[in-house]
Each structure stands twice: as C-alpha cells, then as structure tokens.
Amino acid sequence: MLVFRNRETVNGLETIMNACAWRMVATIAFWTWNISHLVGAENTIFHPASKLELLHTRAAQLNSGLTESPAVAPDGRIYFTDMPFGKDNGMILCFDPKTRQVSDFTKDSGKSNGLTFLADGSMVSCDGADGGGRRLIRWDLKTGKGVTLADRFEGHRLNSPNDLCVDLKGRIYFTDPRYGGAEPRELEREAVYRLERDGKVIEITYEVEKPNGIVLSPDQRTLYVGDHNNGGNRLRPTDPEPKRGAMKVYAFPLDAAGRANGSRRTLVDFGRENGCDGMTVDDRGNIYLACRSLARPGLLVIDPTGRELAFVETGPRNQSGLFDDWKGIPSNVEFGIGDDAQSLYVTVDKGLHRIRAKTRGFHPHLAAK
C-alpha cells in the first residue's frame, strides 16, 4: 500500500534532492511507493491502495544503460526505448495494455531516447550521440521505417537530441544537450529548439545549461524544461573538464507564436543533487517529474507555481531505511489513454512500470484532432 506523510514528517525534504542511476529490476511484481502529500489530508493525485506494477524488465544481456520515454500511441499502446551503452544502437519496444505483452518495434533505434506521437499517428524519436543518429526521426508504425525530420540547426549537426514534446499545431519542441559520445560537437550551445511544420528548426531558448526533460502546459502558454547539468561533455578535446552546474526546472512563458517571451521562472531547484529527467502533465496542468536522486529517487508532482503536491518513492530502501545507491531511479513518465487514462507509466532502471492515479494526462496529439 502507499504510505502518506504530512508536512511535518517530511520537512527538510521540501527542497527536492535527486540523482540518476540504473539497475536490473528484481523479479518481484510490485513495489511499495511511499507518497508524501503536502497540501491536505486527502491525496488528489494517487490512490492510497495503488501499487507499482512491474510490466517489463530487460531480458537481453546488453551493456548497461536504461529504459526511457514511455509514449502513448493513438491506439493506447505504450512505446518506450531501451538504451544500452556502447556499440549497441538500442531498441524501441511496445507494451499493449490489453494483452500485457511487450513486443519489439525496432532493434536498431539509432540510440533513440525521447519519444512522442503526432496527430497522424506517426511516432517521433530523439536519436542521441555515442554512435547514434543525432537527429529527429519520424517512424511509420505500420512499416517500421523511419525518415529524418531534422539533424541540423543553421547547417551544424545537432548535439544529441534528448527529449521532445508536440504542441497543438503539430510543432515539435526538443532539447539538445550533450552528455556523452566521442563525436565532435558542432554547436557552441546546448539549447531548446522547435521543429516547424515546414521542416525549419528554430531556437526557442538557450537560457539553460543542459536541457533535458520538456513538456508544454495544456493551455500551451508555458514551456517546462529540466536543466540537468552533470558536467557533461567538452565542446573541444582541449577544453578543461566541465563542472557540474544547474539542476533546476524552469517555466518559460510563451507568446502566441510559441516563442519564449519574458523571464523564466524557477519551479524547482535541486541544489547540489542531480535534477529531474523526463516529465509530463495532467489535464489540470500539474507537472510530473522523474527525479533521478540517490537521496530521494521518485516522481515529484508539482503545480504550475512549483508547489509540491505529492512525491512517490521509486527506489527500494535497505535494512537501515536508506535508499540503495543507483537503484530504482526513474527516467520518464507518461499517462495512458481511454480505459487506461488514469494509468501512469514510468520507466525505472531497465524496466517499465505502471501505477493507478486519480488524474488524467493531457495528450496534444489527440487533443489536436
């Protein structure tokens, strides 16, 4: 069952801490998630009796890595990526909520990380560096074939597209940091971009050090971006070793044209800990953050002002009551649709999990129809 704690019992943890990690999920089918709900006696986000259900764990003996970016297709199936390190190009997998079966969509994803869907039912992936495609790919679900949508900004190769979201007009916002890979960098900045319907890539903001997770508010007026600067990757081999930097979540106001307009707001500052990875929103406008923390791994739910509504622990505790290092770290999160609309899908370590929520997600590729 879920354990609820009031504000007094979690004081001192309101400045959320985080970190990133991976592990092979144990063979148990359920974990207990501890939830701290900080706005009242009744939790409005999760059911007290909900359990975290393990749906899939990697079977192949691949080189480390993690699962990432669950994304819901128009038919309700959940696609997600499996990103091994090293020479393996990674996979895109598909979970069917009706049959509970997981199948391979492609065994050569080009180091795909983030996924999303467009209104026509096609899927778009962010292909990263370290031997990957460093581009956005549009996938045909029927044929399994992909075509490049974008791999350059102003003639220069992208760094390593990481995560993305689509707006109601079908335009794709994406983050382009560089965390690893020996490929030479051609762009000075690690920025947030938007792919227009005509194929042009425009820069939305570079007021982030290492942009990672990204999502739009349901009213399309705010762009949320996670800044996860772990020190990263040198621009040039002769540059000094990069230092760790910002671990924050920002809210960028957007104008009617969907461009950053006005000063950003800091919603969460993770301090010296690592920041969040992927994120999603519900139809109320609340933001769900996958916090990659050794100190407090889990899902942080905040409202648009940054106020904490709930926190879900995804990391297992040891006999001392502490979190085990580099275990149970979430990477991304997504809601289902239809009969599955209150299911929250979470990639943790090398697995896919699900938990029941009281809320429903907001999906632009469906709302745009």
Regions found by a protein language model. Name each.
Residues 23-37:
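Bacterial N-terminal signal peptides
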Residues 13-15, 21, 25, 234, ...:
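Extended rod-forming repeat segments used as scaffolds/tethers
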Residues 38-369:
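Sequence-structural signature of mature extracellular/luminal beta-sheet repeat domains
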Residues 1-21:
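N-terminal secretory signal peptides that target proteins for export/translocation
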Residues 8-10, 26, 141, 357:
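Sequence-pattern detector for short linear motifs
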Residues 4-6, 22, 36, 76, ...:
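Short, intrinsically disordered low-complexity segments
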Residues 6-8, 15, 33, 40, ...:
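Intrinsic disorder/low-complexity segments
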